[in-house]
Amino acid sequence: MTCRPIWPIVLALVTGTMQAAPSGRLPIPGIQGDDDRTLEQRTTYPWGSIGRLNNTLGPFCTGTLIGPRRVLTAAHCLWNRRTLDWIPPCALHFLAGYRRGSYLAHSLVASYQLGGGQAARRSGPNPNQDWAVLTLADDLGHAVSPLPTLPLDSSLLSGYRETGTFVQAGYSRDRPHMLTRNPRCDILGFSNDDRLAQHACDATFGDSGSPILLRQGDAYHIVAIHIGIDNRTGRGVALTGKAFHGWLEQLEEADPGGETIKACRRRSALPWPSA
């Protein structure tokens, strides 16, 4: 299935100061019909691999451990819209398996690379390359199992549907201190050479960078990451594995180059969000 180009997108990061919206009030952007999200109480595989990406400058997003010291997230989570520059790594903290003030493992971010080698320091992220790989200061592999990635495009979709199901999980604005899981998730169509997809997963602000997982039996693979909401349809927008899987494979073998952000003005203390 092919859909028209998905743009403009409401980028789905959220400031850490925002509170849960009272029930019965305004609808939550990105929640499509009934709210299918459920609170995930477990921190076992694969849920413990997903974590909250805190930012001492304000916004938080979601990320997933893909290697002992590597986290996959959305690039726009690292863009400071006030200063029109990339956020210094020392302002970022990854908390794997975060749950109401506790977590399985934590690390500061030492550096990060912008997806696809994009090097535009002051232009902000391109939606077709809206992913980034964080290099953590600490190895978290002893506490959390990294999740692998797989490509996703229109030629693979039907086969994936036959052999598995799609699940999205992330930290939403209205439930910022618990991982929510959406088991009723599906890919609806593609655009931009299959690098972007519309999806039917309930995901809202704060879920940026959260994985859309393909579950096949007991195995989970990241096939896309949530990056925003289509203004026209209200559907979720994801960056597919076609955009990042091959690049990540190169990263495992050797540094593929691109823009590595290392500059840091200060090291900050761990932000303790209120439960």
Model-found features: residue ranges?
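Bacterial N-terminal signal peptides that target proteins for export
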Residues: 1-7
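Bacterial N-terminal signal peptides
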Residues: 8-16
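Protease-domain processing segments flanking chymotrypsin-fold serine proteases, especially trypsin-like
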Residues: 19-66, 180, 243-275
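Conserved catalytic-core segment of clan PA serine endopeptidases
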Residues: 22-45, 59, 85-142
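Catalytic histidine site
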Residues: 46-93, 190-191
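Catalytic nucleophile loop of clan PA
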Residues: 64, 202-226
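Short beta->alpha transition motifs characteristic of CBS
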Residues: 74-77, 223-232
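Chymotrypsin/trypsin-fold serine protease catalytic domain
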Residues: 127-131, 136-203, 248
